[in-house]
């Protein structure tokens, strides 16, 4: 929850810290809940680190992505992607409206998948007693290298159901959602066809998705 990104580079064989990379362009990086090992995204020879600026609870903190080249010990000074400041998606979110990503999938090339919480654009706030059930999270495809993000053809889900996503062996992406239109369900998105289909309906709100293989 600090104002500075800090990443320790560790020699696991020697059990020693080699260096600590620090950068004040974004706030603390990593996820509070790292049960799916998503604090770091390794893609195209870089380690990408994301800050959600304490979910908006800390005014003045900056959210976004930084990266470290694999094998190096400092953040790449030529790369930053400030999500709130830089990202606009027609019909979804405007630049400078606070927004944050849930933990992403592993990378497929330089692309990852996540849910983008745009509660500010939808005029929802954390102080709403029912905020966890408000449908404010939009499934998105992210290209980390190109710094692009696009909304996918799946409805907004609640923040409770904004963690379950998985890239299958065939390259399609499975999302677990809780939407107003489709209820609690699983969708499969095909990046080649740019289409999504509902593949299952379930009773409880789906959260984590953990592949067993």
Regions found by a protein language model. Give the residues of each.
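Conserved beta-propeller blade signature
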Residues: 46-49, 112-113, 172-175
């Amino acid at each position: 929850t600090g104002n500075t990104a800090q990443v320790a580079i560790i020699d696991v064989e020697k059990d020693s810290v080699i260096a600590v990379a620090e950068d004040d362009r974004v706030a603390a990086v990593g996820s509070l809940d790292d049960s799916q090992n998503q604090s770091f995204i390794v893609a195209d020879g870089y380690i990408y680190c994301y800050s959600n600026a304490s979910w908006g609870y800390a005014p003045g903190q900056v959210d976004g992505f930084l990266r470290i080249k694999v094998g190096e010990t400092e953040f790449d000074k030529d790369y930053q992607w400030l999500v709130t400041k830089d990202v606009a998606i027609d019909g979804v979110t405007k630049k400078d409206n606070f927004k944050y990503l849930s933990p992403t999938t592993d990378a497929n090339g330089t692309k990852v998948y996540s849910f983008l919480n745009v509660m500010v654009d939808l005029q929802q706030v954390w102080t709403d007693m029912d905020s966890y059930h408000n449908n404010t999270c939009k499934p998105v495809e992210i290209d980390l290298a190109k710094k692009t993000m696009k909304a996918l053809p799946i409805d907004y889900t609640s923040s409770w159901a904004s963690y379950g996503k998985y890239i299958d062996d065939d390259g399609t992406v499975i999302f677990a959602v809780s939407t107003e239109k489709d209820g609690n369900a699983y969708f499969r998105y095909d990046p080649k066809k740019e289409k999504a289909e509902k593949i299952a309906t379930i009773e409880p709100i789906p959260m984590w998705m953990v592949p067993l293989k």
